[in-house]
Amino acid sequence: MNERQRLWLGSGLVLLQFGLLIVLALLAWPVMENWAITPVAWAAAAGAVLLIGWTLRVNRPGNFNIHPRPRVGGTLVTSGPYGWIRHPMYTALLLGAWALAWTAGNDEVWLAWWALSLVLWAKSTLEERWMLAQHPGYAHYREQTKRFVPWVY
């Protein structure tokens, strides 16, 4: 796959990511509208918000990109949540989306959650190819740090 194809693939994955997040929210809305949200879902959503805040505090806007291609001149961040997992924003999205799926509890929402998981896995895989090319220390960092879940994966 050449660079242009990777750029198009990255853009497609971003569109899929946001499309699936919208689908998840719409499918979960009838339950959320009635405030029938369990404490487990509240905890997962709060965890997602806290992880996003922590990530943005450590990796300031301007250093990262919504597209999986890293910004030119961006620095490799390995502290804060990045010391635990390589893709904390993706983990936060999955955790927040999990809260929606748990709340709605139907097959369609869980299918959308699994689809989002696959999209974010593909996006992170593509991003890591670019990170390896752009940051000499990324290979070692990748060996030492899990992708989405500390100590697990």
What kind of region is each of these model predictions?
Residues 87:
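Short, conserved phosphate/pyrophosphate- and ester-handling motifs at nucleotide-, phospho-/glycolipid
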